[in-house]
Amino acid sequence: MRTLLLCVIALCSQVMSMTAQVTGRIEYPHRADYEDQVVLPVDDKGLVIQSFAKDSKEGKRYFKTEFYSTAMKLISTDSILIDKGMYFYSDVVESGVLYTVLRQKDGSFMIVAFNPATHKITTTDGEYTRKGSMRNLVIANGSVVFSSTQKKLDRIGIIDLKTGNCRFTDIHFPKVKDKNIFVLENTVIDNTIYALVGVETDVYLLRLDMQGNQLGANNLTADIAERIISASVSKAGNKFFVTGTYSKSKKGGAEGIFFSELKDDRFNNIKFYNFLKLKNFTEYMSDRKQAKIERRKEKAEKAGKEYSLKYLMASHRIMTDGKDYFYLGEAYYPVYRTTWIGNTMITTFAGYNYTHAVLAKFDVAGNLLWDECFPMEPRLMPMYVKHFVSASMKGNNVNLLFTDKNRLVSKLFRNADGNVIQDRTSEIIETDNEDEDVKKMRYSNSQHWYGDNFLVYGTQVVKNSKTGERRKVFAVTKYTIK
């Protein structure tokens, strides 16, 4: 009995509140010479903060790169002249090097590469058409690979980082209009470009070499009835996989996830799982809404049909323990705001609202071994699809870290059954000075940095309770969970 009691106590101790300590803070005065700070963690190598000079001269202004240690101590500062109209577009970390993409409305771009090991900056200049998008940026073998849409034409772009030269592979299919072709995702694996391309109602896998020459094109969905909405290619161990979302209807959002091995450039043992068949998928909803969904499910089942919810999912790369495979997806939906100007109604996109995440374990045949869903609510709605959860293998178990409203969350899932064996949360304290309070915080963002460390940053109005002094700053605060 005593042994059983000790085991229960030990198990309960794993679900606890953790202490988050403010272990570093950087502040930039609101009226300083630089603005539009971009916070870019480089794993455990440090932190980069880039910003743009407010003043310009002869059409040029300075772009500053500051590099901080993990202790938030300034190590190096460097500035380069850029065209006045350039703005931050995207960033990628590859092999420990941070690549920042700056773009201008006329189509020109600059790629700024910062190496934390040498503190050196190199730049690549180039031009791209004004109306061309740059999606799914990947850095590999001295090149930037991306997908793009220009005048209803989709293409794969390859930029040489040494010369700035751009090469493009335009994607065409016989008897298919270019406007009905769209690159869902592209990545580089083993020096080969893999692109998943929507072609009308089908999805093709395209393979290209690093010069843009096409190596093959296979229709992945010729023999399946489901419509693939999103998909990504991963390599785990020595096997390739495709995961993403699907729908059984011709229109609307996704109604479930799929998992398949990629063998000989074709689906092998593809399996589909309705969101509502997953464990706790609706737990984030109110009791009233859950009950409503259950009634609709029962009604559909009596009619011999399957009820489904429409959702979008930001899928992560597949992880493996060497035997089985783990899928992580973050559920979100677009939010629109409606305003009236006179008699005219204007609808504008307000960002993506993230609600919860799904962690699932599959065997190589695509069979679902277990799944867990948990709520997550970031502090802001991003204007683009991104990942808020950081995932890694901790031994054989799966470790997830993320921010949920004003909390820092760490969850450890047991490999065998998906049960949470360690669940730690901590409230975010805004400053490390007990005499100061944050009265206002705008454009707040938070993300996992490395280990058990997080960053929270945004524009703040801080008040000192003793002196009554107020100051407006852009602040970056580091939290370490204990």
What annotation goes with each model-predicted range?
Residues M1-R25:
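Bacterial Sec-dependent N-terminal signal peptides
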Residues V39-L40, D44-E58, E94-K105, R135-K151, ...:
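Short beta-strand elements that form the blades of beta-propeller/WD-repeat-like
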Residues I26-F63, K84-S90:
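Beta-strand-rich domains and repeat architectures in extracellular enzymes and scaffolds
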Residues N218-S230, N274-E294, K299-K310, W370-S390, ...:
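Conserved blade-ending motifs and adjacent loop-strand segments that build the rim/top face
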Residues A71-M110, I121-M134, K175, A217-R227, ...:
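Blade-loop segments of beta-propeller domains
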Residues V203-D324:
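Long, internal scaffold/assembly segments composed of regular secondary structure
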Residues H30-L40, D83-V92, E127-N141, V176-N186, ...:
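Repeated scaffold domains used in trafficking and secretory/extracellular systems
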Residues F63-T70, I111-A117, I156-K162, D202-N213, ...:
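Beta-propeller blade signature
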